[in-house]
Amino acid sequence: MKNILNLLFFCIPFVILSQQILPESERARVVDEILEDRFNNLLPNLMDKTGIDMWILISREYNEDPVLKTMLPATWLNARRRTIFVFYRDKKKNTIEKLAVARYNVGKSIVSAWDKEKEPNQWKRLIELIEERNPNTIGLNFSKDHNIADGLDKTDYDEFMANLPKKHKSKVMSAEQLAVGWIETRTEREMLIYNQLVTITHDIIAEAFSEKVITPGVTTTTEVEWWMRQKVTDLGLETWFHPTIDVQRTNDELVSHLYSFSGRPDNLTIIPGDLLHCDFGITYLRLNTD
């Protein structure tokens, strides 16, 4: 009877955590709903704030711009061939066009604007869209200061500039502030989900630091790290980065934070009185904790 009670005690946290996590099909629905809200309500404000009339994102399959990847619908795990998004903001009319220079729509929000039978050349079709709208500014994802906003590769940049008519070249500018704004800004719904994500993260840490996982004098820091990573996998989530556990003891000298990544010993046995520090983060519904 005692063994059964112990088993139930250990299973309860897992059941509670599992109940908080949506199945894949429901996750996809939520991701796409959030994305549509961001396109329709957040993006126009960001484009107005940063002064960019037209934002063009260009990526090729398996070498995606990290910003463009956050704009893909849940069923798109990668870009397809060369994927080009064009967002055009007409502030006077208070409209925003969300176009794809692709043969198919990208989810529900981004509409195909390329009929390959009429115009076989993808670059020429992109230039037609620019000419038709004649924006004052054209934002591209290149940046010296923000890695996340530097997703346009040199090949696509060179081809774009080679095809762009001379009269539009002076309009090209870095979209770094727009790209960063898109990544850093969270909607009300995302913040509700984020609170749940933080709770799940804290619950995993609490369980990892409990007697269920750690036996003082026996369990090592490496074992706890791998337990945390396995726990995330078992819950159907993803680890944002590999967990690290380091031990702080009374007589130890303070060391640089770099010690946690390269200098700390592996398989350090945890003993009574140790203060445990962890660096841990998970990914859920395209949000991350750290």
Residue ranges and their predicted role:
Residues 215-219:
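Short, contiguous acidic and Ser/Thr-rich linear segments
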Residues 167-173, 238-244, 263-290:
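Short, acidic (Asp/Glu-rich) active-site segment that either coordinates a divalent metal cofactor
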Residues 1-19:
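Bacterial Sec-dependent N-terminal signal peptides
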Residues 21, 183, 252, 285-290:
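Short acidic/His/Gly/Ser-rich catalytic and metal-binding motifs that mark active-site loops
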Residues 87-93, 248-250, 271, 284:
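Short acidic-glycine loop/turn motifs at beta-strand connectors
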